[in-house]
Design a protein with these regions (language model features):
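Cleavable N-terminal export/targeting peptides
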Residues: 1-37
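Active-site-adjacent beta->alpha loops and helix N-cap segments on the catalytic face
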Residues: 84
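N-terminal, post-signal-peptide region of Sec/Tat-exported proteins
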Residues: 49-77
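Outer-membrane beta-barrel transmembrane domain signature
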Residues: 23-43, 48-52, 64, 80-81, ...
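Metabolite-binding pocket within alpha/beta catalytic cores that recognizes anionic/polar moieties
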Residues: 74-75, 87-89
Length: 201
């Protein structure tokens, strides 16, 4: 029964991605199914959404049991002389799937809320996604890689209400006990690439 439920959740979430959105601040930055830190992490993310401009965000995340909460904020400077946007958001992540012999991936539900603030047209983002991946690395080593996919549905409110879908693909590289490097890309209505570096506690 548990196996059937897991497959149903995965199937429904992946089917949303077929329509092909982004995470809490509208940038193509996504989450692995589990955290790299024990207590908390702090770092920075640079994003290039839709090949149009660049965004810089500071990120902080802390743990509460199997749940962790992340806060992020920064600035997005679009190309073409458009006005800059202030980005503010929060994300929560909860592990819901543990790999088995029948299903090889771990999974976490990722939910968020955030906004991009601009004088002539702010937007609210409410993403809900399922991150699926698996930690890999040499035995007895602190170096690990977590490749993952995160199909996500996102509600966007910006004068009207829109439901969009995105598929996030990424990898987290834990290079030491204190440092993690990350890359992710969005496929869909919001394309682009994000690069991140965080320090772990």
């Amino acid at each position: 029964m548990r196996h059937d439920t897991t497959l149903l959740i995965v199937g429904l979430t992946v089917s949303l991605a077929a329509s092909l959105g982004a995470q809490a601040t509208g940038m193509p930055s996504y989450n692995a199914p589990y955290r790299a830190f024990v207590k908390s992490e702090i770092g920075a993310v640079v994003s290039f959404p839709n090949g149009d401009g660049v965004a810089f965000e500071g990120v902080y995340r802390f743990a509460r049991g199997k749940f962790d909460l992340g806060l992020r904020g920064g600035m997005y400077a679009p190309g073409g002389g458009a006005s800059s946007e202030v980005l503010v958001g929060a994300e929560g992540r909860q592990r819901v799937i543990t790999h088995t012999d029948d299903f090889p991936l771990d999974g976490a539900v990722v939910v968020g809320v955030g906004t991009s603030l601009i004088s002539d047209g702010s937007a609210l983002f409410v993403p809900v996604g399922l991150s699926l991946g698996r930690r890999m690395g040499p035995k007895d080593s602190s170096i690990t890689i977590v490749p993952y996919a995160q199909p996500t549905a996102v509600l966007i409110v910006n004068g009207g209400t829109h439901l969009r879908f995105t598929l996030g693909l990424g990898a987290d590289f834990k290079l030491s006990r204190k440092f993690d490097a990350r890359i992710s890309a969005g496929i869909g209505d919001i394309n682009g690439v994000s690069l991140g570096a965080v320090w772990l506690r």
